[in-house]
């Protein structure tokens, strides 16, 4: 089966993102296709490269990045939600006159069209 995941919780502070990550790993281990992960609302904090968890905690932001690098899973970040929460790529930082960007590599700013496309092309969309 082909899946898409929607993450609406931040990397830390709630269970949503870590549960979504574990679900993503289980899908791949069972031979399913994970087309994309769409980060929405507070979920966009999963793409902040400035996140620095304690040394004894799992680095969820880097975990998502590895999922992208190893399995080609698209990591789409809602651009409107990201900009409202201070998550920007180099292009947006330049356009907005900001000193720097903080979007972790492997993540892509995208619109809700990416979520709509995933809904149309995947067998299941699971929200966390």
Swiss-Prot record:
It is found in: Cytoplasm. Its main location: cytoplasm. Keywords: Cytoplasm, Transferase, tRNA processing. Pfam families: DsrE. Heterohexamer, formed by a dimer of trimers. The hexameric TusBCD complex contains 2 copies each of TusB, TusC and TusD. The TusBCD complex interacts with TusE. GO terms for cellular component: sulfurtransferase complex. It comes from the Bacteria. InterPro entries: DsrEFH-like (IPR027396), Sulphur_relay_DsrE/F-like (IPR003787), Sulphur_relay_TusD/DsrE (IPR017463). Part of a sulfur-relay system required for 2-thiolation of 5-methylaminomethyl-2-thiouridine (mnm(5)s(2)U) at tRNA wobble positions. Accepts sulfur from TusA and transfers it in turn to TusE. Its EC number is 2.8.1.-. One of its GO terms (molecular function) is sulfurtransferase activity. This is Sulfurtransferase TusD. The active site is at residue 78. The keyword Transport does not apply. It comes from Escherichia coli (strain SMS-3-5 / SECEC). GO terms for biological process: tRNA wobble position uridine thiolation. Belongs to the DsrE/TusD family.
């Amino acid at each position: 089966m082909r899946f898409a995941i929607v993450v609406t919780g931040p990397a830390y502070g709630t269970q949503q993102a870590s549960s979504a990550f574990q679900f993503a790993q289980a899908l791949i281990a069972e031979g399913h296709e994970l087309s994309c992960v769409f980060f929405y609302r507070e979920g966009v904090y999963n793409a902040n490269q400035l996140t620095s968890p304690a040394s004894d905690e799992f680095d969820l932001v880097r975990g998502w990045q590895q999922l992208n690098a190893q399995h080609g899973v698209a990591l789409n970040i809602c651009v409107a939600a990201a900009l409202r929460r201070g998550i920007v790529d180099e292009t947006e930082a330049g356009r907005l006159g900001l000193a720097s960007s903080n979007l972790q590599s492997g993540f892509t700013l995208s619109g809700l069209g990416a979520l709509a496309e995933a809904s149309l092309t995947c067998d299941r969309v699971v929200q966390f």
